[in-house]
Every structure is written in C-alpha cells, then in structure tokens.
C-alpha cells in the first residue's frame, strides 16, 4: 500500500492496491454427429486451433469415439470467436458439426 500526501489540506490518503484475478478460461469442444466427415473435423482442428495433423487426428478420434473432444482452452472472447468461426465454416461446407464452449 502506498501513502500519498494530499496537497490541498495535508491529509494522507492510502492507495488501495487492486488485486487482479486471471480471466476465466473456457474449453472449446467439438461434438460428434453422424454426418460430418472425419477429414473435415481434422481440417477444422488444424485450421482453427493450430494443431498439427497428428494432434488434430487424435482430437477427431476422441470426438468420434467419446462423442466430444476438447480443441483448446481460451479466454471467453477467444473461445467464443473460435466457436463462431467453426460453426460458420461447417455450415458453409454443408456439415452439421457442433462446436461449443464450456467453463474450464
């Protein structure tokens, strides 16, 4: 805590130190469906989550086998943007791929 003299009346003010907490983090999750090709899921993971082909394939297999796969953990704004980008791309390509974000 810093002590700051007040030049007007000679009183001393104490500056409150602000405690900043880290931002909340969110998982971006792909959900399985019976129609989106596996290769499309791999491409999405590579393109939007900057994963190499091997990692993207592992995420795709997790989605396929377990019904869901985490692509990454991000701050709220970044996670929301990635979800929107993935869903938009999937719809433009004619696929029903679902992408959601959940608190980490």
From Swiss-Prot:
An example Gene Ontology biological process: proteolysis
Pfam families the record matches: ClpS (PF02617)
Q: What top-level branch of life does the organism fall under?
A: Bacteria
What this protein is reported to do is described as:
Involved in the modulation of the specificity of the ClpAP-mediated ATP-dependent protein degradation.
Q: Which protein family is named in the record?
A: Belongs to the ClpS family.
Q: Which PANTHER family match?
A: ATP-DEPENDENT CLP PROTEASE ADAPTER PROTEIN CLPS, ATP-DEPENDENT CLP PROTEASE ADAPTER PROTEIN CLPS1, CHLOROPLASTIC
Q: What is known about its subunit structure? A: Binds to the N-terminal domain of the chaperone ClpA.
Protein name per UniProt? ATP-dependent Clp protease adapter protein ClpS
């Amino acid at each position: 805590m810093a002590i700051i003299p007040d030049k007007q009346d000679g009183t001393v003010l104490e500056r409150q130190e602000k405690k900043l907490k880290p931002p909340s983090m969110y998982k971006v999750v792909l959900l399985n469906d019976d129609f989106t090709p596996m290769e499309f899921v791999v491409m999405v993971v590579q393109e939007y989550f900057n994963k190499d082909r091997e990692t993207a394939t592992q995420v795709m297999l997790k989605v396929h086998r377990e019904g869901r796969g985490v692509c990454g953990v991000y701050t709220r704004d970044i996670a929301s943007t990635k979800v929107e980008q993935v869903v938009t791309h999937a719809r433009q390509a004619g696929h029903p791929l679902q992408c959601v974000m959940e608190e980490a």
